[in-house]
């Protein structure tokens, strides 16, 4: 088997109002190549955008890859590395027997991550990390651009 391509992915989500207009930003780096992704939604939450960013990034990869995925979202990182195992066992309910919020995105993230070898990393937000700052800018600009796209899974 050939060696997997090594990709670095940085992600961030933003929401103005929470709920409100939101956006995500992604920076993907492979060798000397760099790709940026961003999109906005008319009504969503910060957590949904924090989940959508890595989903879009991982789903955009055309083959299985060795991924280092860095985010400033403890919610996303802890959810995908710790909480999700229990949620799946319990039929997508939390320890307190309530339905998992954003289950549509958790299931998509789980499926997207399963195709790759992912090292989930956390970086403190707004601490001068260049790629994280760029993702923050992309996400915020997408949210501020008066997006009209509907986040179909958002439930108030």
Curated annotation (Swiss-Prot):
Binds 1 Mg(2+) ion per subunit. May bind a second metal ion at a regulatory site, or after substrate binding. One of its GO terms (molecular function) is magnesium ion binding. Monomer. Its cofactor is Mg(2+). Residues 3-144 form the RNase H type-1 domain. PANTHER family: RIBONUCLEASE H1 (PTHR10642:SF26). Its EC number is 3.1.26.4. It is found in: Cytoplasm. Endonuclease that specifically degrades the RNA of RNA-DNA hybrids. This is Ribonuclease H. Mg(2+) 2 binds at residues 12, 136. SUPFAM superfamilies: Ribonuclease H-like. Keywords: Cytoplasm, Endonuclease, Hydrolase, Magnesium, Metal-binding, Nuclease. The keyword Hydrolase applies. The keyword Cell membrane does not apply. It catalyses: Endonucleolytic cleavage to 5'-phosphomonoester. GO terms for biological process: DNA replication, removal of RNA primer. GO terms for cellular component: cytoplasm. Belongs to the RNase H family. Mg(2+) 1 binds at residues 12, 50, 72.
């Amino acid at each position: 088997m050939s060696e997997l391509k090594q990709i670095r992915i940085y992600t961030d989500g933003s929401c103005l109002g929470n709920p409100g207009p939101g956006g995500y930003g992604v920076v993907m780096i492979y060798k000397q190549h760099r790709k940026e992704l961003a999109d906005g939604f008319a009504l969503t939450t910060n957590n949904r955008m924090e989940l959508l960013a890595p989903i879009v990034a991982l789903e955009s990869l055309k083959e299985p890859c060795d991924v280092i995925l860095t985010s400033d979202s403890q919610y996303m990182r802890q959810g995908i590395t710790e909480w999700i195992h229990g949620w799946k066992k319990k039929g997508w309910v939390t320890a307190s027997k309530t339905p998992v919020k954003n289950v549509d995105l958790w299931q998509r993230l789980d499926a997207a991550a399963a195709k790759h070898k992912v090292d989930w990393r956390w970086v403190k937000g707004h601490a001068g990390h260049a790629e994280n700052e760029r993702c923050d800018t992309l996400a915020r600009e997408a949210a501020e651009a008066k997006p009209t796209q509907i986040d179909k899974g958002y439930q108030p």
